[in-house]
Amino acid sequence: MKNYKMNFIELQVTLSFCVVFLLRMLGIFSVLPILSKYGLYLNGGNKFLIGLAVGIYGATQIVFQIPFGILSDRFGRKQIIIFGLFIFFIGSLIVVSTNSIFGLIIGRAIQGSGAISGVSMALLSDLIRKENRIKSISIIGVSFAVSFLISVVSAPIIAENFGFFSIFWISAVFSIFSILIVFFLIPSSQNEILKNYKKNIYQKKIKFIFNKIFFRFYLGVFLLHFLLTMNFLIIPYEFELSGLALHYHWIVYFATIVFSFFFLFLIVFYFKFHFFLKNIIEICIFFIFLSLLLFLLSQHNLICLTFALQIFFIAFNILEIFFPSHLSQEISINYYKGSIMSIYSTSQFLGIACGGVLNGLLCTFFNTNHIFLFEIFITLIWFIFSFFCKK
């Protein structure tokens, strides 16, 4: 009988990555609740440039994810992760050395160019056995939620008492701690560097990493975050119309996120996740479709909106854990893993960017019901495509 318990090394790697992701995401998320207010006080600050300062991080992430993945396949994942964290550290220092909105934009752009998400997931999948990857990614997923909740609560307090730039000093310190954790606590993968790397490998590599099976995951994570962004730019408005004051929204988000993670852990650790693994993508897409239908039919009813949001979060979190863990199992050639996981991360950021831009465009000409109808149509296309692209 196979041992599905995590061994000491797997637990150490998982917890180390948890801390690294927690510290890094605290530095990223902490800016969001305060930038719109304090950015106006910077030299040259205006709403457009503040929006650019927010978006430039995601733009450089999109640009550098794949190059970092290719470099990790060639030179090693651990070295590239440390290099990316150092770039994030440099970006933080650039921000605190200026009092200009343009310095903030440049610093945020450099922070984003340390694009290590895909490389980190590739190294994690190198070091964790297949049967334990879902558990490991689930635990790390919690660190994302925790970092978001801590950031939303603490960032305004820190900025009010210690100043706007204190957030970036904290980000710089967290980057150094993260580098030390990666260097001392996370081992290198034995197979992560291709010893006989040749130039003629690229043609085979491109054909391999863009095959139908992988494309299903690339498209899946793109649409998942596309729908998430589309929803969260209109759901707060729907909650306000239902009578829920803005300063109470966090309670609904907190409750639904916590319950969705509880549901996820129940599946992963007690039901072993495998009893409906074969059709998991289609099942979750169906529940996303159901949640969007409930949003459309809610008529600003608070209970209906909350229930729809809960269904959406459950399906979202299951796919958010399933996609990277199962994708890593599909990669039969280890030295392509960094490139594939980086394309996956790029698809994720592209989904967020496209969701935000298209939502802004649609909101200019249509109401929220039309947007929900558009999302339902996209979800149906996704379901059909996923069904026919099954392995």
Curated annotation (Swiss-Prot):
<feature type="transmembrane region" description="Helical">
    <location>
        <begin position="346"/>
        <end position="366"/>
    </location>
</feature>
<feature type="transmembrane region" description="Helical">
    <location>
        <begin position="251"/>
        <end position="271"/>
    </location>
</feature>
<dbReference type="InterPro" id="IPR036259">
    <property type="entry name" value="MFS_trans_sf"/>
</dbReference>
<keyword id="KW-1133">Transmembrane helix</keyword>
<feature type="transmembrane region" description="Helical">
    <location>
        <begin position="303"/>
        <end position="323"/>
    </location>
</feature>
<feature type="transmembrane region" description="Helical">
    <location>
        <begin position="81"/>
        <end position="101"/>
    </location>
</feature>
<feature type="transmembrane region" description="Helical">
    <location>
        <begin position="139"/>
        <end position="159"/>
    </location>
</feature>
<feature type="transmembrane region" description="Helical">
    <location>
        <begin position="48"/>
        <end position="68"/>
    </location>
</feature>
<feature type="transmembrane region" description="Helical">
    <location>
        <begin position="275"/>
        <end position="295"/>
    </location>
</feature>
<feature type="transmembrane region" description="Helical">
    <location>
        <begin position="167"/>
        <end position="187"/>
    </location>
</feature>
<protein>
    <recommendedName>
        <fullName>Uncharacterized transporter BUsg_450</fullName>
    </recommendedName>
</protein>
<dbReference type="InterPro" id="IPR011701">
    <property type="entry name" value="MFS"/>
</dbReference>
<keyword id="KW-1003">Cell membrane</keyword>
<dbReference type="GO" id="GO:0005886">
    <property type="term" value="C:plasma membrane"/>
</dbReference>
<feature type="transmembrane region" description="Helical">
    <location>
        <begin position="369"/>
        <end position="389"/>
    </location>
</feature>
<dbReference type="InterPro" id="IPR020846">
    <property type="entry name" value="MFS_dom"/>
</dbReference>
<comment type="similarity">
    <text>Belongs to the major facilitator superfamily.</text>
</comment>
<keyword id="KW-0472">Membrane</keyword>
<dbReference type="InterPro" id="IPR050171">
    <property type="entry name" value="MFS_Transporters"/>
</dbReference>
<feature type="transmembrane region" description="Helical">
    <location>
        <begin position="15"/>
        <end position="35"/>
    </location>
</feature>
<keyword id="KW-0813">Transport</keyword>
<dbReference type="Pfam" id="PF07690">
    <property type="entry name" value="MFS_1"/>
</dbReference>
<dbReference type="GO" id="GO:0022857">
    <property type="term" value="F:transmembrane transporter activity"/>
</dbReference>
<feature type="transmembrane region" description="Helical">
    <location>
        <begin position="217"/>
        <end position="237"/>
    </location>
</feature>
<keyword id="KW-0812">Transmembrane</keyword>
